[in-house]
Regions:
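Alpha/beta-hydrolase superfamily serine-hydrolase fold, recognizing
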Residues: 1-288
Length: 288
């Protein structure tokens, strides 16, 4: 047996990276992303397809709240293994958070193979910088931006916590006030060695530049972290490794166990005010 990463041979590595195989059928879950998000757009005040960059995919959807003062902002970066989904599938939590007095922003970004992962990270940073610059236009507080993402979005959200990019975008180093990371990938070396690299085309330099575990936050950012019980060992290991590294740096980390969830439906806990996940996030934002 030849190990290609840690103690995985190639076949086992592919199994570890195959999140889709952990659920019987992904189709109804994806349909629920779309239908629940459409319901939010139909029933809540919102500003849709607001441009934050030069290309068509660089747009975001905003769900403001009517508050007396500037509100916290929950920014969501969708998953899809960096090649699927859209902001239109990603605002299912809007009612839960706006009822709690939190503005919601669902970010769209270009996908592989149209763009590189480095460009996706750049676009998400541009979106966060846009939110910071325009927050007061929709009742948001630019000092209380909480970023969140699931799966590939968890990776992208963690890259928003990395140091070294903020000056290029004209934002403060401590821009992010908190983060929620769900079932993310934070070490891209196994991704480079596995089937996702068919569309990502990562090289060793990309792994070094774009792995959140190699670019941990320099500020003590409060984190909420979770993953589903049915995740593969590698997905669980990566979340555990990121949490350990963050705690070692002084970040307050709250792990939320979520029984009876999967890699794909774990995000719906953000849409249910009484769920442990939504409660933890809102409490971390100082609003519970």
């Amino acid at each position: 047996m030849t190990f290609v990463y840690r103690y995985y041979d190639q076949a086992e590595l592919e199994r570890q990276l195959n999140a889709r195989a952990t659920v019987p059928d992904i189709t109804p879950i994806l349909a629920r992303y779309a239908s629940e998000s459409a319901r939010m757009r139909a029933r809540l005040p919102c500003r849709l397809s607001v441009s934050y960059g030069a290309s068509e995919p660089e747009r975001l959807d905003i769900f403001p709240v009517a508050t007396r003062g500037p509100a916290s902002i929950f920014v969501f970066l969708h998953g899809g293994y960096w090649r699927l989904l859209d902001s239109a599938d990603s605002c299912f939590m809007a009612e839960c958070f706006t009822k709690a007095g939190v503005c919601v922003v669902a970010v769209n970004y270009a996908l592989a193979p149209l763009v590189t992962l480095a460009e996706m990270v750049r676009q998400c940073r541009a979106a966060i910088a846009w939110v910071h610059a325009h927050a007061r236009d929709f009742g948001g507080d630019p000092t209380r931006i909480h970023v969140s993402g699931s799966s590939a979005g968890g990776h992208l959200a963690a890259m928003m916590l990395a140091p070294g990019w903020q000056a290029d975008f004209g934002v403060p180093d401590n821009l992010i006030a908190g983060a929620t990371l769900l079932s993310g990938l934070y070490d891209l070396e196994p991704v480079r060695l596995g089937h996702p690299n068919e569309w990502l085309k990562l090289g060793a330099a990309d792994v070094a530049a774009l792995s959140p575990l190699l670019h941990m936050p320099e500020h003590a950012v409060p984190l909420v972290v979770s993953y589903a019980p049915s995740e593969t060992h590698e997905f669980k290991r990566q979340s555990e490794a990121y949490m350990a590294a963050a705690m070692a740096l002084g970040c307050p980390v709250r792990f939320v166990p979520l029984p009876s969830t999967s890699h794909y439906d774990i995000v719906f806990g953000l849409a249910e005010r009484e769920s442990p996940l939504a409660h933890a996030v809102i409490e971390t934002m100082g609003l519970a």
